[in-house]
């Protein structure tokens, strides 16, 4: 069985390095180039068309990738959909993201704060051990700063009011995207990067 994996903002397939499921082949979906002023919905549609998953595909989305997954679900419903550390619709986004989007505050965030993690980044993402800190650091450092900037803007302006039917897994100590009620599985003590830590 194939499981298509959509990673988070600024991350790649290394975010899923600890996931090993017998009989399951992880298919990591690489990000494609974005178009100027492109919406998250439009990008998700082009990414889906570029990936061409089979009819009965299975999908897992992490953080930003979970938002992309929610858009894929509207194009073709997956057999199984798992949403990790993410929100299934716009209403689930924290108020600080919605305010930042309304005021365009996300556009003035220096990329150095995003690409070069420090103790604040590790705190927000809930990354504690040195091995995972190094993995996280390498992933962000290798990311495309222009893609990061675009993705931050697309999240801040995401408009999706269709609630996904995916299986939602969230850490109850997620500081970046605080957990909402109604999660299917709660990871006790888990931060935003439960996929690495838990």
Residue ranges of each PLM-predicted region?
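Active-site signature of alpha/beta-hydrolase-fold catalytic machinery across serine-
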Residues: 18, 71-75
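Active-site catalytic motif of lipid deacylating hydrolases and related acyltransferases
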Residues: 1-55, 89, 105-111, 184
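Flexible "cap/lid" loop of the alpha/beta hydrolase fold
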Residues: 77-110
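Catalytic histidine-centered segment of alpha/beta-hydrolase-like enzymes
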Residues: 37-38, 176, 186-198
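Conserved alpha/beta-hydrolase catalytic His-Asp/Glu region
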Residues: 112-159
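Short beta-strand/loop motif that positions the catalytic acidic residue
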Residues: 168-174
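Gly/Ala-rich beta-loop-alpha elbow adjacent to hydrolase catalytic centers
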Residues: 60-69
